[in-house]
UniProtKB/Swiss-Prot annotation:
Plastid listed as a keyword: no
Tree of life domain: Eukaryota
Top-level enzyme category: isomerase
Protein name: UDP-galactopyranose mutase
Stored PANTHER family: AMINE OXIDASE DOMAIN-CONTAINING PROTEIN (PTHR43734:SF4), PHYTOENE DESATURASE (PTHR43734)
Known EC number: 5.4.99.9
Alphabetic keyword roster: Cell wall biogenesis/degradation, FAD, Flavoprotein, Isomerase, NAD, NADP, Nucleotide-binding
Organism of origin: Aspergillus fumigatus
Biotech / industrial applications: The UDP-galactopyranose mutase appears to be an appealing adjunct therapeutic target in combination with other drugs against A.fumigatus. Galactofuranose is absent in humans yet is an essential component of bacterial and fungal cell walls and a cell surface virulence factor in protozoan parasites. Thus, inhibition of galactofuranose biosynthesis is a valid strategy for developing new antimicrobials.
Length: 510
């Protein structure tokens, strides 16, 4: 057997949040030799940011930085240490329903709806509350969970149509163990009180406040984190593209023919791609049981000041079929640097109603922007040719844009692997796939590496990498991967970027 060109103790494939988490921890421990490779020149993976020619920024989806982990905060604060690197926002979100903006969470604010809809919703909630008292089995599907928690009124008005738009899979085909803290259970007494008094209920959930980077979008965070790693241990771009993983002799082949030998492998590529790269037919067969949806990210840059009807809304949910998108993010509200300066002159491309502008002469701003997400799967196809126009029409239909609004920039990008779907078959497949890989010294981790949506946010993904390294180096239990509800229900403060061992090492060196 020929020797590999490069040999390391731990090889990390992928420089998204998970791979960077693994690399940060390896660099901190300063024990095993390591290297990180990625086929993109720019690190960030699914948490990167694009810039349109006109100067509008769009994240690859509706990212916000909410953290369950002190270690994650430490790493971000180290990468972007200045106060003016960040903006902090209150979560202000609404559901568009029956021509109204209903504050989120929808199920706590049905007092905003027309009276007959209120009756249907409360009727269903009373039935659900009575059922819950006598139920002695857990719900088997997401659909059963919805009906049991909220009743058929809210299920039909919001939860079923909205979740089909998000997941591109019917709720009857999804399991419900993933839910944890992600959906607010309604309080029947509070809802009834609010309906009678005509009140609305306030913020709920983990992202009630969140911070967002001032410059460079979400992608700017991960570029900054990657910049804290030693350059000689990174290999990004074409020269870092993995074409083959030979699990038997523990080598990875890159596109330029370079081979890297490893003792342990942390792979953050989608596990279905990993199985293909390994040419392991048994694993390929098992990964076929995993379902995912694709995500279309659509951006629309608009001339003018942000209208009052939009105000300081952050993100908005759309369960109805008068628009293709399930979520809109007012991306210009997150940072003034997410769009061009008002003094920049841009021509009008079209009006929101699709008509041509009277003049195509470049004019000054100011500008604001909307980012939209549309899901796609075999069960919910999307027409690529018309999706942008359909979304702009949807913005007019939902009164997000006026027909005469001037559009100065558009953006559309499709991400094949967008959401790892928590289908009924998921755990049966994962509980075979992940241990089989681990037996071969491969830790497959990340949003699509370990395929668990409930630990697929940026903070979770980062910690999946950190914890994989701790497991490799000293056998520590991977809490995030194995106990999602546990980590999501507490402040995880035990692990820090500067720990005791490093403090002692520093004092010795002095």
């Amino acid at each position: 057997m020929t020797h590999p060109d490069i040999s390391v103790d731990v090889l990390v494939i992928g420089a998204g949040p998970t791979g960077l988490g693994a690399a940060k921890r390896l660099n901190q421990i300063d024990g095993p030799s390591w290297m990180i490779v990625d086929s993109n020149e720019t690190p960030g993976g699914l948490a990167s940011t694009d810039v349109t020619p006109e100067g509008f920024l769009y994240d690859v989806g509706g990212h916000v930085i909410f953290s369950h982990y002190k270690y994650f905060d430490d790493c971000l604060d180290e990468a972007l240490p200045k106060e003016d690197d960040w903006y902090t926002h209150q979560r202000i979100s609404y559901v568009r329903c029956q021509g109204q903006w209903v504050p989120y969470p929808f199920q706590n604010n049905i007092s905003m709806l027309p009276k007959e809809e209120q009756v249907k919703c409360i009727d269903g909630m009373i039935d659900a509350a009575l059922e819950a008292r006598v139920a002695n089995t857990k719900p088997k599907t997401f659909d059963e969970w919805i009906v049991r928690m909220m009743g058929t009124g809210i299920a039909d008005l919001f939860m079923r149509p909205y979740n089909f738009k998000v997941w591109a899979v019917p709720t009857t085909k999804m399991q419900c163990a993933w839910l944890g803290e992600r959906v607010a259970a309604p309080n029947l007494k509070a809802v009834t009180t609010n309906v009678i008094l005509g009140k609305t209920a306030g913020n709920w959930g983990p992202n009630a406040t969140f911070r967002f980077p001032a410059r460079g979008g979400t992608g700017g965070i991960w570029i900054a984190v990657a910049n804290t790693l030693p350059k000689e241990k990174t290999r990004f771009g074409e020269k870092g593209k993995v074409t083959k993983v030979n699990a038997n002799n523990k080598t990875v082949t890159l596109q330029d023919g370079t081979t890297i030998g490893y003792k342990k492998l942390v792979s953050t590529m989608a596990v279905d791609f990993l199985a293909e790269a390994m040419n392991d037919q048994e694993l390929v067969g098992l990964t076929k049981q995993l379902f995912y949806s694709s995500t279309h990210v659509i951006g629309v840059g608009v001339r003018g000041s942000r209208p009052e009807r939009i105000g300081d809304k952050c993100w908005l949910y759309f369960p109805e079929d008068n628009c293709p998108f399930y979520r809109a993010t007012i991306f210009s509200n997150y940072s003034p640097y997410n769009q061009p300066e008002a003094s920049k002159k841009l021509p009008t491309m079209q009006l929101a109603d699709g008509s041509r502008p009277q003049s195509t002469e470049a004019k000054e701003g100011p500008y604001w922007s909307i980012m939209l997400e549309v899901s796609e799967s075999s069960m919910k196809p999307v027409n690529q040719e018309t999706i942008l126009a359909d979304c702009i029409q949807g913005l007019v239909n939902t009164e997000m844009l006026k027909p005469t609004d001037e559009i100065v920039s558009t953006y559309h990008r499709r991400f094949d692997h967008g959401y790892p779907t928590p289908t009924l078959e998921r755990e049966g497949a994962l509980t075979q796939i992940l241990p089989k890989l681990q037996d071969k010294d491969i830790w497959s981790r990340g949003r699509f590496g370990s395929w668990r949506y409930e630990v697929g946010n940026q903070d979770h993904s980062f910690m999946l990498g950190v914890e994989a390294v701790d497991n490799i180096v000293n056998g520590a239990v991977e809490l995030t991967l194995n106990y999602p509800d546990f980590v999501n229900g507490r402040q995880n403060t035990e692990r820090r970027l500067v720990d005791g061992a490093q403090v002692f090492a520093k004092s010795k060196a002095q």
